[in-house]
Structure formats: C-alpha cells, structure tokens
Amino acid sequence: MGQVLPLVTRQGDRIAIVSGLRTPFARQATAFHGIPAVDLGKMVVGELLARSEIPAEVIEQLVFGQVVQMPEAPNIAREIVLGTGMNVHTDAYSVSRACATSFQAVANVAESLMAGTIRAGIAGGADSSSVLPIGVSKKLARVLVDFNKARIMRQRLKLFSRLRLRDLMPVPPAVAEYSTGLRMGDTAEQMAKTYGITREQQDALAHRSHQRAAQAWSDGKLKEEVMTAFIPPYKQPLVEDNNIRGNSSLADYAKLRPAFDRKHGTVTAANSTPLTDGAAAVILMTESRAKELGLVPLGYLRSYAFTAIDVWQDMLLGPAWSTPLALERAGLTMSDLTLIDMHEAFAAQTLANIQLLGSERFARDVLGRAHATGEVDDSKFNVLGGSIAYGHPFAATGARMITQTLHELRRRGGGFGLVTACAAGGLGAAMVLEAE
C-alpha cells in the first residue's frame, strides 16, 4: 500500500458533501432543445440553493464546467452566479476536463476548502448537445477579420470575391480527437477487439444499465436528487430522464448495426451513451461549517486521483489507471468498497476497464504494481444503472455519479463508494466517497 493522503483541512475537518442535485437528462434535440448549457446550469444551481435553504452568502466559491463551450458565455460559472441571485462577490471560475469535468470542479472546490481560502462552495457542470457552437470555415473566418480591418468598400468586396461556395458552409463541432482524428467510438472498437469483448457482452451490459435505471426510477430512489425542469413554453415539465428504455428486451439490442466499424464492428448506438443535455451540481463545505449550519452531510470526499495516458490506443482506460491511485490515497482496497460507479461511455470501454482492474498482468507490466487492483464485484457495480441509460451531458456526469452514489450508500447504512470515469485526451478520474 502506498502513501495515504487524507483530505482534511488544516484544522482536521473532512470535506463534506452536504447536498447534490441534477436536472433530468434529455436526449439531444428533445425536451431541452434550444436551452443553452448556461441556462441549465442556472436552473440546477438555483434549485439546489432553494432546496438546501443555505443563505446565498454562505457560498464563497462556484466552480463549474462546460465541455461544449459557447463563445458568448466563456465563463459559465460566473454567469450562473450572476443569474441565480447568488452574492455578487462569490468567486466563480470555469474548468474543463472533458467527460471528467465535474470531477475536476469538485476537486478544485475541495482544494480551496483544504487551503482554508473558503469554507463552502458549489461544484458542477452542464452541457447541451442541442445548442452547439456552429462555426465557419477557416478561410471565411480570416476574410471576416480582414473585412473589419478594411477601410474602403472596394477592399471589402475584393475580400469576399476570394470565397467559394464551400467556404460558406457551416462547420459543426468536432467529434474526433484533435491530436489523432480518432472518434471515441473508434477507440471503443479498438478496445473491444484488443480485449476480446463481444457484441453480446456489450449489449448485455447496456440492457442491464437500462433495466437498473428504470427500476431506480420506479422505486423512487432518484426522486430526491433530480429536480423537475420547467422549460419554455412551460406546457409540459420534464420530470424524469427521457433516454431510459424500461421496456426493451435483449433481442432489441441485437437488431442495431455497428455505428463506427460498419463491417466488422460491435459498438452500436444502443451499447453507447447518447448525446445528452443536462446539468448537475453539489455543495461542499468543511465538516465544521456543516455542523455550524445544522446540516447533516450526504457524505465525505475521501480521496481523488487524475491520470493521463496515450491517445493512440486504449485511450478510454482512465478508470483502470486512476482507481488504484484513488484507493491507495484513501487507504482502501477494492474489497473495502460498498459501491462502484463507473461511467459507461461505451459498454466496450466499461468492460475493458473491469477486465483490467482484475488483471495481474496489467498491474505488473503496465502500471508497475505488484498486484491487480481487484476484481469488480457485480453486486456492487453500477447498481442503479449507468450513463448508457441515463445519458451523458459531458460536464454534468461526475456530479450525477457522486450524488447518486452517496444517496445509495446512505440507503445501505453507509460505507465507501468509488466513482470513476474515462475522458477524452486519455484522461481518467476516480474519487472515493464515504457515507455514515
């Protein structure tokens, strides 16, 4: 066991997570069509504060993330402060770590708490796949800049005469890695082939995810942590996530064609997480501050770890790399965990990470560790379903997982929970949570 790194303030206070909330998650171009991420962020933070009844001046910092950023609101965190009635003096800044963005936001607030610069803060993220920054071609962008510099009309007309029809076509946001040109689905396909993960295994995991998420909603387990969203024109509120397929059968998954490798692939739209809109946030504070305010924390942040690996192959193995670090820093092993919640970007990626967490060879030859991190107990794993069912608003997923895991730990009488995710750019994140 390596060095344990306790997450405590200088006064010995633990980092308490006192509350968490999210919007329902909606598939792209459905219930939240036309609602930008900044408005989703305002929606969830405003409701989170209202439900917590914490005075606005208690919150000293807000760290928020958005992966698909809009040029008109580059600092989503500050816009949320200004748009929710929070104290205008609240420090606010934005972060981005791809799919692990709200993990990063939580870590940043925790570090401020440990440094003693604040005693309470909010962390979270929001993304919209329905309101996208549609760009212009590089040639048109250059002409537009030169157009503003030109002094006479003749110069301006000459600039536009250089353009061709193709230069005027809108440019959608990139879906591939900037450094490699590979789509995440391409990497998921590569990992499925490398680690021998079959189409049947992927479909079975996806089906399990939807079944468990549907059951969680049916049992009322998500009611406290998901707000009702009222959206223009205010005719039909969104109460639940609208991606969950509660009535599907395993045979339904087999009907879909591969989405990336059309000839020989196994990754489909059904065993991958969909493009999604939504927001999520949590309130963190020092343990003593929570006691002063008479608040009972949902739980505590025990440890966290971020890792980075190569992007050309196995880019989505973040959980297999970050989990042993987070456990080591918490002074725990896999067997100590009550719950494990892993982000399901793709069923193939999820199954590959599960496989390698239990691999002695991977631990020895790749991680340089003496023993495997540990086998993943299916009875502890994604017990309420995962991102394949709920959806994945990139910057919101981490805060969803943290809130969901803490609530489930409390229902089970406490214990330790691991939340972990892969992210674009070969990044990985893992956090160990504790509930009493």
UniProtKB/Swiss-Prot annotation:
InterPro entries: Ac-CoA_C-AcTrfase_FadI (IPR012806), Thiolase (IPR002155), Thiolase-like (IPR016039), Thiolase_acyl_enz_int_AS (IPR020615), Thiolase_AS (IPR020610), Thiolase_C (IPR020617), Thiolase_CS (IPR020613), Thiolase_N (IPR020616). The gene is fadI. CDD domains: thiolase (cd00751). HAMAP family: FadI. GO terms for cellular component: cytosol. Its EC number is 2.3.1.16. The keyword Hydrolase does not apply. Heterotetramer of two alpha chains (FadJ) and two beta chains (FadI). This is 3-ketoacyl-CoA thiolase. Keywords: Acyltransferase, Cytoplasm, Fatty acid metabolism, Lipid degradation, Lipid metabolism, Transferase. Catalyzes the final step of fatty acid oxidation in which acetyl-CoA is released and the CoA ester of a fatty acid two carbons shorter is formed. Its main location: cytoplasm. It holds the Pfam family Thiolase_N. It comes from the Bacteria. It catalyses: an acyl-CoA + acetyl-CoA = a 3-oxoacyl-CoA + CoA.
